Amino acid sequence: ITCVMKEYTPEFDQMLFYLPLSGSTFKKVYYDEFLERAVSKFVPAEQLIVPYTATDLETAENVTHVIQISENELRKKQVAGFYLDIEVSASQSDPSEIREEMDEISGVSPNHLDQEITLLECHVDLDLEGYEDIGDNGEPTGIKLPYVVTISENNGKLLSIRRNYSPDDPGHKKN
């Protein structure tokens, strides 16, 4: 893990540092198309939005990851076709009290040179027209399927909709 995932140890160390301060932390492991390998990232609890009634992330109807991304990184992903090539402006919102307190405790200060864009990566179940779940009788079942929908927090523009299940899986389980 640490030989291939160069970010694993620093991300894990950062997660362990934040754990006593926040009470909860998360790891996001996913395949990165640009690096062409699995990646493991630390996600602070304040960057994960989960319904109050959810008992776990696996069965939650929606989970939203608040992603801070630089204009340059977003542009790279747009040029590569990962996100739609549309204009998205940097977020104008001030950091939350939680973020300011965590930054102060950890000795980090925000960099105002590179404007960050806030994206909302929503892991949701949807019944999309033209992509419905089809039953044995060939008719749509009305069952919602798992997707990852990414939008800009600043203006609500849609950047991507990606299937979050294997096309070979008849049960359409979340990846």
Which residues make up each language-model segment?
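Extended alpha-helical, oligomerization-prone segments that build pores/tubes and scaffolds
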Residues: 1-175
